[in-house]
Curated annotation (Swiss-Prot):
Topological category with respect to the lipid bilayer: Peripheral membrane protein
Protein name in UniProt: NADH dehydrogenase [ubiquinone] 1 alpha subcomplex subunit 12
GO process annotations (BP): mitochondrial ATP synthesis coupled electron transport
Modified residues annotated as N-acetylmethionine in this record: M1
Swiss-Prot/TrEMBL keywords: Acetylation, Electron transport, Membrane, Mitochondrion, Mitochondrion inner membrane, Respiratory chain, Transport
Gene for this chain: NDUFA12
Species annotation: Gorilla gorilla gorilla (Western lowland gorilla)
Gene Ontology CC annotations of this record: mitochondrial inner membrane; respiratory chain complex I
Family in the record: Belongs to the complex I NDUFA12 subunit family.
Length: 145
């Protein structure tokens, strides 16, 4: 009887993603193919799911959109693509998703969510007011003879 339930759950995972093609697309993109109830969608197109049959910490997840802020994110997904209103629900800080209880407006929360810019030319580099302990060596410029 347990084998039947395992096969039934596997069939639900394949049909829950729109057939074999959709299942393989989700599996290769996220390395996981969970099926749950759709809780909501943010303004960027990310979809948020919940399945309380999973253990705590894996019972809520996001399926990222393929395009966000003009950037193709099909294979290049990043955890910073989750806006702050969904972050608190996704990490179990609250049981109420933003679809039922909207986030209160704060002046430090951006209206347009930004990616993590670490490792890009747009990254934040703070200005240092202290002298360096080690100075770069600049060779003397002498003309060739």
């Amino acid at each position: 009887m347990e084998l039947v339930q395992v096969l039934k759950r596997g069939l639900q995972q394949i049909t829950g993603h729109g057939g074999l093609r959709g299942y393989l697309r989700v599996f290769f993109r996220t390395n996981d193919a969970k099926v749950g109830t759709l809780v909501g969608e943010d303004k960027y197109g990310n979809k948020y799911y919940e399945d309380n049959k999973q253990f705590f910490g894996r019972h809520r997840w996001v399926v990222y959109t393929t395009e966000m802020n003009g950037k193709n994110t099909f294979w290049d997904v990043d955890g910073s693509m989750v806006p702050p209103e969904w972050h608190r629900w996704l990490h179990s800080m609250t049981d109420d998703p933003p679809t039922t209880k909207p986030l209160t407006a704060r002046k430090f929360i951006w209206t347009n969510h930004k990616f993590n810019m670490t490792g890009t030319p747009e990254q934040y580099v703070p200005y240092s007011t202290t002298r360096k302990k080690i100075q770069e060596w600049i060779p003397p410029s002498t003309p060739y003879k």
